[in-house]
Amino acid sequence: MQKIEKPWGYEIIWAKTDKYVAKFLHINPNSRLSLQYHVNKEETIYVMSGQLRLQLGDESQESTVGPGGIVHVSPGKVHRFGAGDSFVMLCEVSTPELDDVVRLQDDYKR
């Protein structure tokens, strides 16, 4: 397992092969990831705890996904994950292109 600190929380990669990657994402309260898309990466997210603030496409499409909810993100789909007043824990399973991130907006100036 590999823990990677992020400005919004951390990731724990617990499986990595040439065909898929599985990781946990811990999003700190009142934090969010960048508004982004992936050219090739495809991912499915399972909400383990907390209330995921989800943006798909433009900002008017923000919704909340609770524990047990599943979100599929296809290549090219603009998205952002975030947390409200309490942390969010996600499980992500994706294709292995971990560096395939095009950031459109980022609170941390990356």
Give names to the regions the model predicted.
Residues K23-N40:
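Conserved short histidine dyad/triad with adjacent acidic residue
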Residues I4-K6, R80-R110:
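Double-stranded beta-helix
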Residues M1-K23, S34, R103-R110:
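A short, N-terminal "cap"/entry segment at the start of jelly-roll beta-barrel domains
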Residues D58-V78:
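Short acidic-glycine-tyrosine-enriched beta hairpin
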Residues N40-R53:
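Glycine- and acidic-residue-biased ligand/ion/polar-headgroup-sensing regions
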